[in-house]
């Protein structure tokens, strides 16, 4: 928070002060044609927080006092909800990458710092309650893309996407699932529960710029293979299959992301 105060020339005495800075930052990127924000959160966060409660937590943390898990979730939920509110006003897409537990190997973190291979996935997460609370707060007012690490959660996210309609989409297979096998399994499953057209398409947040072409090429080949198999089994007419592939690979994705 000290770096934020220095960068923006403000004193963060309340949660609203932080929200004001967030608004300024959001305006800066919006003026430069940003169309999405990406949020990595270990557990889904509710959208029904009370500002007064979150403000108390913020002031407590700024005073150097320790926070409970519930207090941290209250603050993080408030911050994410404010980000989503700003996104809904400007038409940005809100990406939620769910379930990654960061830096679990202490010796690796101590010697090399964060994000160097010490992250894992967490299967024991309750997606439905908190996530539905968040989505209900912005029902039909916010484009959201949901990503999960554990394929066991695909059923929950696919049915949530279907329940909330076209503005809540499923993201492409992520991280350890971002392989031909992982992509195929995901596409086959979401096709089976009738959400294939409610798919956000391939989006890469990779730091490896030179891999962009190969990653998108691999996804399109897997997509064509999966849909082609469905045509071969008589599950889908060829004309519809071509429209689906075209939409996921380009047309629908371009429209969803406001490109």
Residue ranges and their predicted role:
Residues 196-197, 214-259:
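Mid-to-C-terminal alpha-helical segments outside catalytic/metal-binding sites
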Residues 144-146, 242:
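Beta-strand segments within the central parallel beta-sheet cores of soluble alpha/beta enzyme folds
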Residues 147-154, 175-183:
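Acidic-and-aromatic substrate-binding clefts and catalytic sites of carbohydrate-active enzymes
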Residues 2-143, 152-168, 185-201, 218-224, ...:
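Histidine/acidic residue-rich metal-binding segments in metalloenzymes
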Residues 53-57, 130, 182, 240, ...:
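Exposed alpha-helical structural elements
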Residues 205:
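Intrinsically disordered, low-complexity polar regions and short flexible loop motifs
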Residues 171-175, 183-190, 240:
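Glycine-rich flexible loops
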Residues 209-212:
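Short active-site-adjacent structural elements
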């Amino acid at each position: 928070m000290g770096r934020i105060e220095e960068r923006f020339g403000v004193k963060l005495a309340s949660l609203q002060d932080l929200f004001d800075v967030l608004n300024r930052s959001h305006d800066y990127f919006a003026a430069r044609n940003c169309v999405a924000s990406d949020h990595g959160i270990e557990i889904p966060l509710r959208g029904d927080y009370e500002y007064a409660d979150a403000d108390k937590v913020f002031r407590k943390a700024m005073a150097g006092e320790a926070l409970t898990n519930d207090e941290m979730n209250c603050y993080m939920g408030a911050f994410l909800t404010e980000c989503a509110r700003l996104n809904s006003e400007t038409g940005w897409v809100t990406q939620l990458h769910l379930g990654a537990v960061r830096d679990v190997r202490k010796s690796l973190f101590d010697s090399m710092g964060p994000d160097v291979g010490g992250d894992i996935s967490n299967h024991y997460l309750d997606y439905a309650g908190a996530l539905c609370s968040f989505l209900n707060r912005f029902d039909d007012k916010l484009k959201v893309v949901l990503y999960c690490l554990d394929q066991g959660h695909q059923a929950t996210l696919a049915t949530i996407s279907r329940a909330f309609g076209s503005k809540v989409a499923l993201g492409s297979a992520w991280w350890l699932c971002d392989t031909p096998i992982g992509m195929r399994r995901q596409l086959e499953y979401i096709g089976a529960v009738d959400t294939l057209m409610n798919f956000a398409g391939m989006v890469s947040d990779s730091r490896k710029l030179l891999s962009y072409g190969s990653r998108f090429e691999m996804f399109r080949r897997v997509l064509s293979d999966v849909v082609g198999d469905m045509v071969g089994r008589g599950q889908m007419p060829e004309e519809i299959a071509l429209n689906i592939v075209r939409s996921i690979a380009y047309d629908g994705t371009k429209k969803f992301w406001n490109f």
